[in-house]
A protein has these predicted regions:
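Short hydrophobic beta-strand element within catalytic cores of glycosyltransferases
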Residues: 282, 301-308
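Nucleotide-activated donor-binding/catalytic signature segment of Leloir-type glycosyltransferases, i.e.
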Residues: 250-271
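An aromatic- and histidine-rich active-site surface loop
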Residues: 86-98, 102-131, 135, 291
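Conserved donor-binding/catalytic core segment of Leloir-type glycosyltransferases
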Residues: 18, 200-219, 225-230, 238
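Aromatic "clamp/platform" in nucleotide-sugar-dependent glycosyltransferases that forms part
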Residues: 287-288
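Membrane-proximal helix-turn-helix segments that form the acceptor-binding/catalytic region
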Residues: 144-162
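A charged, aromatic-enriched C-terminal amphipathic alpha-helix characteristic of glycosyltransferases
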Residues: 46, 343-381
């Protein structure tokens, strides 16, 4: 086993838990935010005092002071890709140390690890959710990749626990740093929706292919669009997604698209998005470096047949319920085969729901709660892994 196990039973006693390092709640963007909302509200329901540090996408409208039982601390951030997360986390730590002093802090994203020594100096037990292999993301240049590799080492050195959301991530930290992790995946919502709102987009159930992804190179939206365009598809490809700092990549996707491709941009209406997942003939998932992906979990929770980029993280979630691709030619062949046998896609969607049942938010919360109790009882660790790399995964 590369990941240490955590107990599943709730115990009495209230904890003060701070969650920081993300855009916070309400969840609008990304897996971390979804996890914080789903886990944080359940922890609050169990009597814990949960504080979430949040950024506001609409500065003219203040965030609520409380949300689904959680307290919300709204703080600003620099609007620059390389500094937005770090600047917000710096302010969060500055706010937390003199005012809050929680029993446990959960820091999301290993990029925030330069702030861990300050938390440790204040004797606050801290767990770091390390996310995926950020240094492999195509959007980062050499400096960014070096930073993320250094940040991983700091997270290993200064965290009292590391959280991995996929076995592949746990294996990476075990092999590269000889460090244990707590393996806690995300939950998959059970999505049972109608199809009435598809008409707003001129769509009908089973009558379109779907992509939902942030426009980043490692999510392979361009490969999916390219493969679809090469196919003989009659049904449209609906593309949901955007990115605030990806104009060049967005332009490439637009250039690859033909008249059958419908680029919707971001869709923040969750009911409509769920109907898109549930109504798609096939959902194409191109994420490759981020561990267990919430978009994939939401898709299988809606009963979507899934064709996914062939990496261990996606196979871990889908197993035999998925089909897999690596190139645009692969995508083209899968598109054509899906349209040739739509009944088979319905059966694959049923298999997706069976896989989704393995990812339960209540059980996820059990594991977070057990981890927080363990850290609060043990306090900061005196002996920690060194953070030195074994060289198993060279840059």
């Amino acid at each position: 086993m590369t990941a240490s196990s955590t107990a599943s039973a709730s115990q009495p006693g209230r904890l003060r838990i701070a969650m920081l390092g993300t855009r916070g709640v309400p969840a609008r963007y990304g897996g971390f935010e979804t996890a914080i909302e789903e886990v944080g509200r359940r922890l609050a329901d169990r009597g814990h005092r949960v504080l979430v540090y949040s950024r506001n996408p609409e500065p003219g409208t203040p965030l609520p002071r409380t949300y689904r039982g959680m307290r919300v601390a709204e703080l600003p951030a620099l609007k620059k890709r390389s500094l937005e997360t770090l600047s917000h986390t710096a302010l969060s730590v500055r706010h937390l140390l003199p005012r809050v002093h929680p029993d446990v802090a959960i820091v999301f994203n290993s990029a925030n690890s330069p702030f861990l020594p300050a938390l440790r100096a204040a004797r606050i037990p801290v767990a770091t959710h390390v996310d995926g292999l950020e240094w492999r993301r195509g959007k980062w240049g050499p400096t960014g990749r070096r930073y993320y590799r250094a940040a991983e080492a700091l997270a290993v050195r200064y965290s009292d626990a590391l959280i991995a959301d996929a076995q592949g991530i746990a294996d990476y930290y075990a092999e590269e740093f000889e460090a244990d992790t707590d393996l806690i995946a995300y939950g998959a919502p059970r999505v049972d929706v109608g199809t009435d709102r598809l008409a707003e987009l001129g769509l009908q159930s089973g009558g379109f292919h779907l992509v939902v992804a942030r426009f980043e190179i490692e999510n392979h939206v361009d490969v999916i669009v390219d493969g679809y365009v090469r196919s003989g598809a009659r049904l449209p490809l609906v593309v949901v997604g955007s990115a605030p700092y990806a104009n060049e990549y967005t332009a490439r996707i637009e250039q690859l698209a033909d008249a059958r491709v419908r680029l919707l941009g971001g869709v923040w209406d969750q009911e409509l998005l769920d109907q898109l997942y549930a109504g798609a003939l096939v959902y194409y998932h191109g994420h490759s470096v981020g561990g267990t992906n919430p978009s994939l979990l939401r898709a299988i929770g809606a009963g979507a047949a899934v064709d996914a980029f062939d990496v261990s993280f996606n196979r871990e979630v889908l197993d035999d319920a998925g089909r897999y691709w690596a190139t645009a030619a692969d995508v083209a062949a899968l598109v054509d085969s899906a349209e040739a046998d739509p009944d088979a896609q319905v059966l694959r969607g049923n298999l997706s729901r069976e896989r989704a049942a393995l990812y339960d938010w209540d059980q996820v919360t059990d594991r977070y709660e057990a981890l927080c109790r363990r850290l609060a009882e043990q306090g900061p660790r005196r002996r920690r892994p060194s953070g030195r790399r074994t060289g198993a995964f060279p840059a």
